[in-house]
Amino acid sequence: MAAGVAVLALALSACGEKKESVTSSVGAQSMTLMLDWFPNADHVGIYEAIANGDFEKAGLDVHIQVPSDPALPLKQLEAGKTDVAISYEPEVMLARNKGEPLVSVAAIVQEPLTSIVSVGSKHIRTAAQLRGKRVGDAGLAYQHAYLSTILSHAHVPAGSVKEINVGSNLVPAMLSGRVGATLGAYWNYEAIKLQRMHKHPNVIRMDQVGIPTYDELVVVARKSTVVDHPDELRRFVQALGRGYAAVRSDPQAAVDNLVKANPGLDPKFELASVRATLPTFFSSDASKPWGWMSADQWNAFGQWMLDQHLISNPNAVADASTNELLAGQGL
């Protein structure tokens, strides 16, 4: 695990990250966690675990790092500059395809958040209505593959749709009319933001239009950490699970703690987002512990990535996730 917090902070400051420290626990194991992006409702259980002392009770002194770019967390994890990172199932597969020995050790958001979103008087309510439209995305290869699969599934000729890379400007691209829809906006973030702006967004979720379901947000560690430090990781993952359980018990209190740690956030928006996202923090199978990942689901999504030539190495899929650190597992 990472040691020497001052040295680590110096190394990371050169990489353009913001580092958030939490109160140190004397004698606790220092551990660094890099978020996938800026703090938001998806991370509410992390901040709840900090506020409630769940990590401290587990003998861990957790330090949160906020990346300047969502592509950074797995790179920093690969380089050994953070102990664990939050990322996305497709990104884990892509990193493993390049030979990076990374493993997902828990799912935070257990279904896709990525959606097709449209606004205006001519809502796009079905994939078939994408015909003749301009669709904006962030330019990611797997988003292009999503669109191709969706169009094929809806029997829409790919040439009838113009794909436009709008970067992170998904909402402005929709509001300006530059695109008729976006693929990449989250139904629990951009769509709720548009609702609060009274823009009446229409949302089509990925798993409704031919894309195999996947875990949008996952906790990732190096395989060497899973092998060499399973006790620390197990304590971390299970403390995190207690944080998310507390969110389910009292979403308002959890949002209060999220906003207290990140004063720039809008409390009303975050509460709306947390309430919308809450069911996805837990398995649909109540017998499964928090963080559960379905091997069948990971294999099916990995096979889709292979079929789409996003990855070429079957080993990128095999053993990409493990449930052995979850409560009641692997003991």
Q: What are the language-model segments listed below?
A:
Residues 298-331:
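Conserved C-terminal helix/tail region of periplasmic/extracytoplasmic solute-binding proteins
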Residues 11-14:
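C-terminal motif of bacterial Sec signal peptides marking the signal peptidase cleavage site
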Residues 22-167, 171-188, 204-205:
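Short, glycine-/small- and polar/acidic-enriched structural segments
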Residues 1-7:
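Sec-dependent N-terminal signal peptides
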Residues 108-118, 199-226, 237, 276-280, ...:
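Periplasmic-binding protein-like
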Residues 90, 169-172, 178-264:
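Pocket-lining segment of extracytoplasmic ligand-binding domains
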Residues 227-308:
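Secondary-structure end/capping motifs
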Residues 16-18:
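Bacterial signal peptide processing site
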